[in-house]
Amino acid sequence: MSDLHNESIFITGGGSGLGLALVERFIEEGAQVATLELSAAKVASLRQRFGEHILAVEGNVTCYADYQRAVDQILTRSGKLDCFIGNAGIWDHNASLVNTPAETLETGFHELFNVNVLGYLLGAKACAPALIAGEGSMIFTLSNAAWYPGGGGPLYTASKHAATGLIRQLAYELAPKVRVNGVGPCGMASDLRGPQALGQSETSIMQSLTPEKIAAILPLQFFPQPADFTGPYVMLASRRNNRALSGVMINADAGLAIRGIRHVAAGLDL
């Protein structure tokens, strides 16, 4: 039996991409899974596909009332909350400082930070009482842009650096009751969109990046799928496998940190 059997897991943005892969993985692990998802169509799809195994709540991560409504439903259903995974986010399609008009930069900043930073903070606030009571955990999705430049423009990169500070502060404030950690995946096949303020709300990340371009920059030389990143979340959510980690950010970058100066990887001819 999995360590996560009957654990109550709350994931934001569970309708597609990494969020959907996390829903699939935690259900596979035997957990009671809930998600807060903005898209009504994706909520309907989740309910149709997973039935009683999913509690899918339509709502916006920038709205505290939506979070509280979801948490209330989770507690009614499961009687507890063991892990909150803040995952919903948006990207800026590498919109640069120089080429973005000032007024667009300002509105884009507020929209992107509302989702990527405030959304995490509001989720933590809504989930904290139940997680403190059950001595559970929080996990937040970061990005390779939390460590390196070039994984997005200044708006996205700054938002992911802000999220690392949020993780550290929450880990400090909530210790010893709640473990707080992060996972930073590299580029993957997903439906990640951009801010409406930048005209990117209907543009997927895969319209800006090709599988070949992503694989070429990674020392492990493959095009990651969302399911490739679910393992660290499972480990961090498990009380048995993670008793000692808090304030830790796992850089799941397919080797980006060890790229060579002359070559992406030295073993390409092995």
Curated annotation (Swiss-Prot):
Family annotation (InterPro entries): BphB-like_SDR, Dihydrodiol_DH_HcaB, NAD(P)-bd_dom_sf, Sc_DH/Rdtase_CS, SDR_fam
HAMAP family in UniProt: HcaB (MF_01647)
S-S bonds: none
Pathway membership: Aromatic compound metabolism; 3-phenylpropanoate degradation
Cleaved signal peptide residues: none
SUPFAM superfamilies: NAD(P)-binding Rossmann-fold domains
Lineage: Bacteria, Pseudomonadati, Pseudomonadota, Gammaproteobacteria, Enterobacterales
Native species: Escherichia coli O157:H7
Keywords: Aromatic hydrocarbons catabolism, NAD, Oxidoreductase
Active site (record annotation): 156 (proton acceptor)
Residues annotated to bind substrate: 143
Catalytic activity, EC: 1.3.1.87
Broad EC category: oxidoreductase
Pfam families, per database record: adh_short
Function (record text): Converts 3-phenylpropionate-dihydrodiol (PP-dihydrodiol) and cinnamic acid-dihydrodiol (CI-dihydrodiol) into 3-(2,3-dihydroxylphenyl)propanoic acid (DHPP) and 2,3-dihydroxicinnamic acid (DHCI), respectively.
Amino-acid positions noted as binding NAD(+) in the UniProt annotation, renumbered to this chain: 10-34
GO terms, molecular function: 2,3-dihydroxy-2,3-dihydro-phenylpropionate dehydrogenase activity
Name of the protein in question: 3-phenylpropionate-dihydrodiol/cinnamic acid-dihydrodiol dehydrogenase
